[in-house]
Regions:
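Secondary-structure boundary motif
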Residues: 6, 59, 89-93
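Substrate-recognition/cap regions that form aromatic- and gly/pro-loop-enriched pockets
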Residues: 57, 63-65, 77-87
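Conserved ABC ATPase signature
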Residues: 5-58, 68-77
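C-terminal lobe/lid and adjacent interdomain/linker elements of RecA-like ASCE P-loop ATPase modules
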Residues: 81-139
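Loop/turn-to-beta-strand initiation segments
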Residues: 62-64, 76, 95-101
């Protein structure tokens, strides 16, 4: 959890906590600006979404193929670039990295990617065409 908490702005530490009465497991978040920790119900949706993506790729046995639809929805714009970098590092930087497929309509997510990472799926009459941006438009 230390690696993950370092990658989420505003979070100093993430700790698991088990409620002794209900036996439920919770996450407690510590931030330098707050004396007491807070739980996931007090976190923003975007922060929780970023946490979920990071948990997905930091799994010791990640899925070989990961599909994410519009990961930028609900994320603070400055986190999008950080998320793209984390996904790229996961897919290319380690053994057993996943192949990652992302869909988006947002230019700022595409801007965070390398041209060779971007593919366009275009509907043409009764057919579809798939183009790599690097090959189709830049060469």
């Amino acid at each position: 959890m230390e690696n993950i908490s370092e990658k989420i702005p505003g979070i100093g530490r993430i700790e698991p906590y088990r409620d002794e009465v209900t036996n439920n497991l919770y996450l407690l978040f510590r931030d330098k600006g707050f004396a007491k920790p807070f739980n996931q119900r007090q976190m923003s949706d975007g922060t929780l979404k970023m946490l979920c993506y990071l948990l997905l790729i930091y799994d010791p046995n990640p899925a070989p193929f990961i599909c994410i639809e519009e990961p930028e929805n609900g994320l603070y714009h400055q986190l999008v670039s950080a998320l793209v970098n984390e996904l790229r590092d996961h897919a290319t930087g380690r053994k057993n990295g996943s192949q990652i497929f992302i869909t988006t309509h947002q230019p700022y997510l595409v801007d965070a990617m390398q041209p060779e990472e971007v593919w366009i799926l275009k509907k043409e009459k009764m057919d579809f065409r798939l183009y790599n941006v690097l090959v189709k438009f830049l060469m």
